[in-house]
């Protein structure tokens, strides 16, 4: 921890969140050390020569002036980790900001750590079962993988995130860490309130909560937004490496991490790269992403919301992110408008795990048949709109009927949405999911009405619902 021999310098220049500090000869703090001046914590980013360093502030530099004394803390920023973090909200420095009292600093870790060695990695790819039918069947997540979550406002990103947090806790005995990177303060507050309401955070007994929250919102300096992802990741690494758990790490939004790095890079005087981004874009992204992985002890599976500026997928920020992703989950406004939740687009969502040698032939064939049926239905929709269903061939009418059942069967009641829908949530195993879709596509359930498949768990519930509709 902190060395007792204090090393002090003084401020020579302040430009916004960037501070130049002069230290005594031979006492320069190394890069990434944290230094503190009048309650403002900064991180050393550059050694300038002439005994001066350039540091980036993690909080506002209001009130600082030249000549003020700066203390080197002789260590990088360190944050609390472990069970005491569950149910709490932290800032980039690991300080609780939820007015729920202090957090035990008994166990802390520095936010800058090396990624696991190759010998520690779990090399055999395995599926991370979420209990959500559409995800597990059509775009399965890799244990220790990275998933991009794409979707506009109001299509159900937050509810999907909360359901995943709930399911990993129940099915895998795991915990989650949520890193709010450069998003709206209001959204962070709404998420916290919804988590309390749905039981993901247990306000009366915090140790039973399933998630720790780390926020660096868009009103904060770029230094905080650039480092808050590392703070969340450090907390997740402790649960993986020490508690040997499966961890879900949510980063909302990974684009803001890049954006903050771009701001800091410009403030540090680096020459910009393509589209004005930092020249170190790939390195910064790689440093974060390489720490998110499976080891033999546990795993960190990361779900990252990806904002695509001006819907341009070739922009360097999303393009760099894509190279790290194992799967993409795309939320569709059209499905949300139809009331099909989760509104995951079955044709746009992809996964590198959907290969015969990984998931097996039954899973692979079922997924391809489902996609084929839905694609054919999509192609026929224009004809149906112009000429009507009666003008289709017998075979196409059957395809449409089955596709509509498949589409409805991809919906599912969520545990965290129980308070809104009144329907109890359902966790559906992968085997049950495959069995259900096979029965629909094989024509075994052609006589059942399509509304029987809407918002049910496994196929037995759909059959039961059909019987109650008849009765």
Swiss-Prot record:
**Catalysed transformations (reactions):** ATP + H2O + 4 H(+)(in) = ADP + phosphate + 5 H(+)(out)
**Any keyword Cell membrane?**
no
Q: List UniProt keywords, sorted A-Z.
A: ATP synthesis, ATP-binding, CF(1), Chloroplast, Hydrogen ion transport, Ion transport, Membrane, Nucleotide-binding, Plastid, Thylakoid, Translocase, Transport
Q: Name one GO biological process term.
A: proton motive force-driven mitochondrial ATP synthesis
Enzyme Commission no:
7.1.2.2
**Tell me, how does this one assemble?**
F-type ATPases have 2 components, CF(1) - the catalytic core - and CF(0) - the membrane proton channel. CF(1) has five subunits: alpha(3), beta(3), gamma(1), delta(1), epsilon(1). CF(0) has four main subunits: a(1), b(1), b'(1) and c(9-12).
Q: Where in the cell is it found?
A: Plastid, Chloroplast thylakoid membrane
Reported function: Produces ATP from ADP in the presence of a proton gradient across the membrane. The catalytic sites are hosted primarily by the beta subunits.
What name does UniProt use for this protein?
ATP synthase subunit beta, chloroplastic
Q: Name one GO molecular function term.
A: ATP hydrolysis activity
Q: What class of enzyme is it?
A: translocase
Q: Which gene encodes it?
A: atpB
Main location per UniProt? plastid
Q: Which GO terms describe its cellular component?
A: chloroplast thylakoid membrane; mitochondrion; proton-transporting ATP synthase complex
Q: Which family does it belong to?
A: Belongs to the ATPase alpha/beta chains family.
Annotated ATP binding sites: 151-158
Q: Show the InterPro entries listed in the entry.
A: AAA+_ATPase, ATP-synt_VA_C, ATP_synth_F1_bsu, ATPase_a/bsu_AS, ATPase_alpha/beta_chains, ATPase_F1/V1/A1_a/bsu_N, ATPase_F1/V1/A1_a/bsu_N_sf, ATPase_F1/V1/A1_a/bsu_nucl-bd
Gene3D superfamilies per record: 2.40.10.170, Bovine Mitochondrial F1-atpase, Atp Synthase Beta Chain, Chain D, domain 3 (1.10.1140.10), P-loop containing nucleotide triphosphate hydrolases (3.40.50.300)
Q: Does the keyword Transport apply?
A: yes
Membrane topology, as annotated: Peripheral membrane protein
> Pfam families in the record, alphabetically?
ATP-synt_ab, ATP-synt_ab_N, ATP-synt_VA_C
């Amino acid at each position: 921890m902190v060395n007792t021999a204090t090393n002090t310098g003084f401020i020579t220049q302040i430009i916004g969140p960037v501070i130049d500090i002069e230290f005594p000869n031979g006492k320069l703090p190394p890069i990434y050390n944290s230094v503190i001046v009048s309650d403002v914590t900064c991180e050393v980013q550059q050694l300038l020569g002439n005994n001066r360093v350039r540091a980036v502030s993690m909080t506002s530099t209001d009130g600082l002036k030249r000549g003020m004394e700066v203390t080197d803390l002789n260590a990088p920023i360190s944050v609390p980790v472990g069970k005491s973090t569950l149910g709490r909200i932290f800032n980039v420095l690991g300080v609780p900001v939820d007015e729920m009292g202090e957090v035990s600093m008994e166990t802390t870790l520095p936010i800058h750590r090396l990624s696991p060695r190759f010998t520690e990695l779990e090399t055999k790819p395995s599926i991370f079962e979420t209990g959500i039918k559409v995800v597990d069947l059509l775009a399965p997540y890799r244990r220790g993988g990275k998933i991009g979550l794409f979707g506009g406002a109001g299509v159900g990103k937050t509810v999907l995130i909360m359901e995943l947090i709930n399911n990993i806790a129940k099915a895998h005995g795991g915990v989650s860490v949520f890193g709010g990177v450069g998003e709206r303060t209001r959204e962070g507050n709404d998420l916290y309130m919804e988590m309390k309401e749905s039981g993901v955070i247990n306000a009366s007994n915090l140790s039973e909560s399933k998630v720790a929250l780390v926020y660096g919102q868009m009103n904060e300096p770029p230094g905080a937004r650039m480092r808050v992802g590392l703070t969340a990741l450090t907390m997740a690494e402790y649960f993986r490496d020490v508690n040997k758990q499966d961890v879900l790490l949510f980063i909302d939004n990974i684009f803001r991490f890049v954006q903050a790095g771009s701001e800091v890079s410009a403030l540090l005087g680096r020459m910009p790269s393509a589209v004005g981004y930092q020249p170190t874009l790939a390195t910064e992204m790689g440093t974060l992403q390489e720490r998110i992985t499976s080891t033999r002890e546990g795993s960190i599976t990361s779900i990252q919301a990806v904002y695509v500026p001006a819907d341009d997928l070739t922009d360097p920020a999303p393009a760099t992110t894509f190279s790290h992703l194992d799967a993409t989950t795309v939320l569709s406004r059209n499905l949300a408008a139809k009331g099909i939740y989760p509104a995951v687009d079955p044709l746009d969502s992809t996964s590198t795990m959907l290969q015969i040698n990984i998931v097996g032939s039954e899973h692979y064939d079922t997924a391809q048949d489902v996609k084929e049926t839905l694609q054919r239905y999509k192609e026929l929709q224009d004809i149906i709109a112009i000429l009507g269903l009666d003008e289709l061939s017998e075979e196409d009418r059957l395809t449409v009927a089955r596709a509509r059942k498949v589409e409805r069967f991809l919906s599912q009641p969520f545990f965290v949405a129980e308070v809104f829908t009144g329907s109890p949530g359902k966790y559906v195993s992968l085997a049950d999911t495959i069995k259900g879709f096979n029965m629909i596509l094989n024509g075994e359930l052609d006589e059942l009405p399509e509304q029987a498949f809407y918002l049910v768990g496994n196929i037995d519930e759909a059959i039961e619902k059909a019987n109650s509709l008849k009765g």
